[in-house]
Amino acid sequence: VPDIPKVYAPESIEPRWARYWVDQKLYRPLDDASGPTFSLSLPPPNITGSLHMGHMLEHTEIDILMRWHRMRGQNVLWLPGMDHASISTQMIVERELGREALPDLEGPGARRAWQREGQRRRLEMGPEKFLERCWQWKEQNGDTIRRQMERMGASVDWTRARFTMDPA
């Protein structure tokens, strides 16, 4: 019998189990939908943030519900999605453009100056180039919440993830 460590080190155990659960497709509904089914859509967090305690509580409660339905033998789908959060995304990308233009600016008022400069640069770029820049930002940063939920072990079927700006 191996010794049980005195201190729990989640980083040495949890990623392995999370990968196993995904590899075994435990969170995917069966193709055979002849039995009872249960599904919920993930209330879509937006791409601009990180999970906060409210998300954690809500996702834990939903995860418990989804697992309970699976244990009852139901075919369960927890469908994930992300919201584009256009206004928040615009503000973040504008601030990023401002920071790039004013890299040495620090201290009080820097954030406001970055935002103003970013707005000026957005207008200078035009809508097409700015939208392209927003898509680049989304590709680089939009998966933060997904990674956090995966780390928590949320029983979501990520193979079906949707984004509010996905083509229909």
Label every PLM stretch briefly.
Residues 1-168:
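N-terminal, positively charged nucleic-acid-binding surface of large information/translation enzymes
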